[in-house]
């Protein structure tokens, strides 16, 4: 593989570090050449690192383009990789004339690159904005940068994420801590706790908030000191602010620091106060030194720092919150050690330079593989379901379906019908169309190979006749427009109205190629409706394949809710439904019973926040025992992880039962819909009661029975393991309809 990199050559900061370290390491594996458009320290340093570097400094763009075309034609390159405005402009011109795929790395928000320079913003900024749209692929230097690009309409299928890699090999400071602090002018003895920041002193870095927060924290912790490494236009203002707040003697401005190893080794706390970031090197530098970190919650920072688990986050500009975090760390050396060690471990695993190099090579291989992919008039899959409504169960279904499609064909274009297309694009990195944007999704259907009617209970008329008619319409349209049609891990029924049953039977019989079902009741329902033509396969709910988040992440979530990670809990998931109001008191009293009898703290966990939180509060209003309502359970892996920490789960929601069953938690189901009893029967569990027949005695009796099952691994895991085995039939059926090889175990 041979790649040519195009960059202006005037870059500094994180972009410079990223490009030079990446190219130095890539050149050990593949052929890499770099072209700069100006001579200077960047090009000189690249040569010193052994990177093949050539400078085309001619200001005549057309002449430079001719030279580049000749170099690329004669050099036998496979791919063009651009960086920055000038590189992107050249890449956009070279794309068609060379026939090579062109990718760019977006190092920063291109709309902010020329703030304060109106002429450059109008010229270079406009050119860069246009050029970015003309390139084939884009790489964001953090997940947050990719999110930003998606929000601005860039195709998620043509975006990649890479992080600024760091060499985590052991580093040795040039001098000891006390000597270094004296050398930069900070008076501090061994009892002092040193907080620090390395940043340009400009408005975006918002060091003023750090000084304000430090001054408040210093009043409570006089042993605190602040070391600021960096320079910029705000230096004098910041010095004046420190004096005004009475901490000039405890704040040291060290200027630009070249010996970053010794700087970070001299700190006790690393900080970042930026108003905007992609993914700052300052955090991984601090992580390399195992420093506990306090950072503003911006850009890609939350992808590295899990609040309360391996660091502390605060809202940008909030000096009071920052001060509280500084005080907490200054007063607790053990907490500093634990947070620093956890951050170091995560950074080594995910952000080491070796990982960055491997990721870049993977991206090149993906791009070249896609270039070889046959281009047909039809490609990809369109997925339709109850998505984009904030229901954790439906979101988990989509996550599982997308994961299984990517496993079958990592380059398969995936489109999703969603009530919130923007949220779906950001969350799942897929293209999305508004669910009821009929012209748009019909246009897409004419170009896809597979239409998936997603998992869940879409074929029912209990909640709505119109939703059933809509889903049947999309199935018919997809088949008429030339798609293979798959109903994926779904439930069927109840469909009560005779005309609806007749319509559903006709459409499924005529327009569906295969149906994979999540339970035996759905199989019986299809038989009763006379649906026989499609291939019908008994499988399982797709979400049984999803894992829980790492234990330390769930520990942090529980701690942030004021809950002991090692506590004993009973989970309740409730939803509004006809008849629930009359039974709400029973749930509250049963929760009290679990607390009084077994010492289980009731925790209410919603699946669909906009509906379930109110139902949980309604039941909790009848309680006397201590309890907690988690109003937002987060992403699917977080939600599953929270259910895994329950000793028993009582639920009206199907996916609370599915998530809990997958983690071996004893279950009590309250049946408002046949899907609850169907699932529990399917996995061999018998503790469930119809909502209308629920009594206090029956509910507490089933809680007693569930408590007795705690620790019965064979019973609790047996049915779910069988589900995970048969769930493979979902993706096997999809592979068959797409003409792909079946998935590997």
Regions found by a protein language model. Give the residues of each.
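Nucleotide-sugar donor phosphate/pyrophosphate-binding loop at the beta->alpha transition
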Residues: 62-66, 101-103, 111-134, 147, ...
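Active-site anion-handling motifs in enzyme catalytic cores
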Residues: 369-745
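Short hydrophobic beta-strand element within catalytic cores of glycosyltransferases
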Residues: 35-36, 292-295, 305, 649-651, ...
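Short His-centered aromatic/hydrophobic patch
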Residues: 82-88, 106, 653
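Conserved acidic donor-binding segment of nucleotide-sugar-dependent glycosyltransferases
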Residues: 307-308, 312-319, 328-333, 687-694, ...
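A conserved mid-protein helix/loop that constitutes part of the nucleotide-sugar donor-binding site
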Residues: 13-24, 193, 197-219, 233-240, ...
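A short, active-site helix/loop in glycosyltransferases that binds the activated sugar's phosphate group
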Residues: 133-161, 166-170, 515-532
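Aromatic "clamp/platform" in nucleotide-sugar-dependent glycosyltransferases that forms part
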Residues: 256, 275
């Amino acid at each position: 593989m041979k790649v040519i990199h195009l960059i202006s050559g005037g870059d500094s900061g994180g972009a410079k570090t990223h490009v030079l370290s990446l190219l130095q390491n890539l050149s050990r594996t593949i052929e890499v050449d770099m072209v700069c458009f100006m001579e200077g320290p960047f090009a000189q340093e690249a040569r010193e690192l052994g990177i093949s570097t050539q400078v085309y400094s001619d200001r005549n763009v057309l002449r430079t383009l001719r030279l580049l075309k000749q170099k690329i034609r004669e050099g036998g390159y496979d791919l063009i990789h651009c960086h920055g405005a000038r590189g992107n402009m050249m890449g956009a011109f070279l794309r068609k004339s060379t026939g090579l795929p062109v990718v760019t790395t977006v190092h920063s928000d291109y709309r902010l690159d020329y703030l304060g320079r109106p002429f450059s913003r109008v010229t270079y900024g406009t050119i860069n904005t246009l050029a970015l749209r003309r390139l084939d692929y884009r790489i964001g230097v953090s997940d947050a940068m990719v999110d930003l690009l998606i929000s601005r309409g860039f195709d998620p299928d043509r975006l990649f994420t890479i992080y600024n890699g760091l060499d985590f090999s052991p580093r040795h400071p040039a001098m000891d801590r006390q000597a270094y602090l004296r050398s930069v002018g900070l008076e501090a003895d061994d009892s002092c706790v040193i907080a620090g920041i390395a940043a340009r002193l400009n408005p975006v870095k918002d060091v003023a908030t750090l000084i304000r927060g430090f001054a408040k924290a210093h009043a409570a912790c006089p042993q605190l000191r602040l070391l600021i490494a960096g320079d910029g236009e705000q230096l004098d203002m910041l010095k004046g602010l420190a004096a005004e707040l009475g901490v000039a003697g405890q704040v040291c401005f060290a200027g630009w620091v070249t010996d970053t190893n010794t700087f970070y080794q001299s700190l006790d706390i690393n900080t970042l106060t930026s108003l905007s970031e992609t993914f700052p090197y300052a955090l991984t530098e601090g992580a390399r030194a195992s420093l506990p970190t306090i950072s503003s919650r911006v850009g890609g920072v939350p992808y590295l720092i899990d609040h309360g688990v391996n660091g502390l986050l605060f809202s940008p500009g909030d000096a009071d919150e920052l001060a509280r975090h500084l005080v907490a760390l200054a007063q607790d050396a053990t907490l500093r050690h634990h947070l620093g060690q956890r951050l170091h471990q995560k950074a080594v695993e995910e952000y080491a330079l070796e990982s960055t190099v491997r990721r870049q090579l993977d991206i090149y291989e993906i791009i070249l593989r896609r270039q070889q992919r046959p281009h047909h008039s039809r490609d990809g899959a369109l997925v339709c379901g109850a998505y984009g409504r904030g229901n954790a169960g439906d979101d988990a279904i989509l996550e599982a379906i997308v994961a299984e499609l990517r496993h079958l064909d990592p380059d398969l274009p995936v489109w999703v019908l969603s009530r919130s297309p923007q949220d779906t694009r950001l969350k799942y990195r897929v293209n999305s169309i508004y669910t009821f944007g009929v012209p748009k999704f019909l246009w897409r259907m004419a170009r896809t190979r597979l239409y998936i009617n997603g998992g869940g209970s879409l074929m029912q008329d209990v909640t709505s006749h119109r939703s059933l008619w809509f889903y049947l319409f999309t199935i018919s349209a997809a088949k008429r427009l030339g798609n293979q049609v798959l109903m994926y891990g779904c439930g069927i029924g109840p469909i009560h109205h005779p005309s609806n049953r007749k319509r559903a039977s006709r459409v499924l019989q005529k327009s569906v190629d295969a149906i994979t079902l999540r339970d035996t009741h759905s199989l019986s329902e299809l038989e009763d409706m006379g649906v026989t033509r499609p291939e019908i396969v008994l499988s399982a709910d797709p979400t049984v394949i999803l894992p829980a988040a790492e234990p330390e992440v769930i520990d942090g979530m529980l701690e942030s809710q004021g809950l002991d990670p090692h506590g004993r809990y009973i989970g309740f998931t409730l939803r509004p439904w006809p008849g629930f109001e009359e039974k709400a008191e029973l749930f509250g009293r049963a929760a009290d019973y679990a607390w009084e009898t077994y010492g289980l703290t009731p925790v209410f966990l919603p699946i669909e926040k906009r509906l379930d939180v109110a139902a949980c509060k309604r039941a909790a209003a009848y309680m006397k025992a201590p309890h907690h309502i988690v109003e937002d359970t987060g992403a699917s892996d977080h939600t599953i992880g929270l259910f895994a920490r329950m000793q028993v789960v009582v639920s009206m929601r199907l996916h609370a039962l599915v998530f809990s069953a997958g983690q071996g938690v004893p279950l009590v189901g309250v049946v408002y819909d046949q899907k609850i009893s169907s699932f529990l029967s399917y996995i061999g569990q018998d503790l469930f009661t119809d909502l209308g027949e629920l009594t206090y005695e029956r509910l507490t009796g089933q809680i007693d029975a569930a408590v007795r099952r705690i620790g019965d691994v064979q019973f609790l895991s047996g049915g779910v393991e069988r589900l995970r085995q048969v769930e493979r039939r979902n993706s096997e059926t999809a592979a068959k309809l797409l003409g792909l090889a079946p998935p590997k175990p």
